[in-house]
Amino acid sequence: MSKPFKLNSAFKPSGDQPDAIRRLEEGLEDGLAHQTLLGVTGSGKTFTIANVIADLQRPTMVLAPNKTLAAQLYGEMKEFFPENAVEYFVSYYDYYQPEAYVPSSDTFIEKDASVNEHIEQMRLSATKALLERRDVVVVASVSAIYGLGDPDLYLKMMLHLTVGMLIDQRAILRRLAELQYTRNDQAFQRGTFRVRGEVIDIFPAESDDIALRVELFDEEVERLSLFDPLTGQVESTVPRYTIYPKTHYVTPRERILQAMEEIKDELADRRKVLLANNKLLEEQRLSQRTQFDLEMMNELGYCSGIENYSRFLSGRGPGEPPPTLFDYLPADGLLVVDESHVTIPQIGGMYRGDRARKETLVEYGFRLPSALDNRPLKFEEFEALAPQTIYVSATPGNYELEKSGDEVVDQVVRPTGLLDPIIEVRPVATQVDDLLSEIRQRAAINERVLVTTLTKRMAEDLTEYLEEHGERVRYLHSDIDTVERMEIIRDLRLGEFDVLVGINLLREGLDMPEVSLVAILDADKEGFLRSERSLIQTIGRAARNVNGKAILYGDKITPSMAKAIGETERRREKQQKYNEEHGITPQGLNKKVVDILALGQNIAKTKAKGKGKGRSTAKAGIVELDMTPKALQQKIHELEEQMMQHAQNLEFEEAAQIRDQLHQLRELFIAAS
């Protein structure tokens, strides 16, 4: 199943990339646990990491701080490694309201969630790839540190089928039911099976376009074939096939019965404690809820909120870390932490927030104390589990620098020859009028401007002032969701308006080559928003334009300003020297605007079957670019119904065309959600 990693790129490493690749590889081969890649905006950090993965041939997990950047990285890695397993592992909830209790108003909030089936399938595909192959890149969000089914139990539950194997049809059906597959002879969809005589068709939970046909003859597996679940066309026959459980949380029956006994013991102990403290209501509530859950587990093998009993189901002791995606990563795996200055603090904060909510539930009798062990990893547990790690950032945090010691690999030179912006410091007194004249100069030559303020009030007032003076301006604030934010950025790039005003929203991962000016108001007010890292990140937003310039408005130069200006000058000088030595003239980036949201259109093209379908699919995707996630989901459901209708009418060509369009829309939905 595994193939060697094969990097697909029209470019060869250049600038600082060859040296960065060599140093990172040497460090990994020498057994260094931590290294940092200090890569400036536009220097091709992802390309460098892709080269390291391809050269060392090691399974890799890439951690991103949010779904937007994870989707962007997934698209890029998919293009770099089209022949290998590039997987996507983020939270599969479209909406999630955890159960909670508010003592002040005596309000209990039930858990409420809506699961995205397509992302659930991608998560299952990611763990399957990690268990089966070596040529795997999993792009994950911080969801990777949350509890997942135990890999040992997951492996024990798998159903292995081989040609010539002696097995009764009923035994196969019973095993499929244990894997939580359901029988459905009418609608054949993911996670179901159907039976026709001695033929069993199984639609694997981790697959979206291939199903398995098991043909039996007198209790012997005669043939295993892979077929298209839509058209019924057989793609190939295979000598063996492994069917994975429908969910990561599936547990063998004997383990459930054992866990139930342990839950009863804990309930008895907890009841004594509550009664001793005269907490009669809490004792009654806990007994009632737990007995109901035990009844459900006995009858069905699972219950609502079964994750709260995960400690017993995975056979772990009190306080032990839960099984996570890291347990599926091979021992010689590689971890890449993207935008590490944001991702690392995020990992540290997840456990504490989760703990506070659960302690209230335990105290008031809604959950047993063991529910506290259904949690994300603590930071020290993450450190213990993490394999060899490369931190990637333009502004690494103190943690990464401390861990890496001297192993900070500089990637300052851009292959395009683009220089870091020229920085000017101007007085605060005339900042608004000065900014207005700068905006007019940029708007006249069809370039864009980003303005960052310190407060929401100032951002609103400035937006109003610029509008009154006839400028085309938009204000990007924290209430705007990810998708609307992406739409605003796209409109800025398309020239629907010239100026974007924001507070802390103009930093990581915004790729806007049209922006030639970044204005930072009140740059001399020392603090989080005007720290050295924040300033370098914000200045970097103008580093993708040939005429890039940053104006810092301040009456004095603070230590943070001095460091940010010094670092930017250092990078600029190094790039200038490289350009002179190699005769490079800086080239502006000509990145297509649809690239921001049209996640990996090449993915859809490679999946589309038949000539010309890739082009029509991509076109269909662009039409959908301005749709909200809700509208996209609605569109996906409509198309799925149309596709099934065509298949039932035996109109397989039309059904296949709709399926190709669905691939594109699902990729868009990932980028947008």
From Swiss-Prot:
Q: Which Gene Ontology molecular-function terms are recorded? A: ATP binding; ATP hydrolysis activity; DNA binding; excinuclease ABC activity
Q: Where is the Helicase ATP-binding domain?
A: 26-414
Q: Motif Beta-hairpin: which ranges?
A: 92-115
- InterPro entries from the UniProt entry: Helicase/UvrB_N, Helicase_ATP-bd, Helicase_C-like, P-loop_NTPase, UVR_dom, UVR_dom_sf, UvrB, UvrB_inter
Tell me yes or no: is ATP-binding among this UniProt entry's keywords.
Answer: yes
Subunit structure and binding partners: Forms a heterotetramer with UvrA during the search for lesions. Interacts with UvrC in an incision complex.
This protein is called UvrABC system protein B
User: Which gene underlies this protein?
Assistant: uvrB
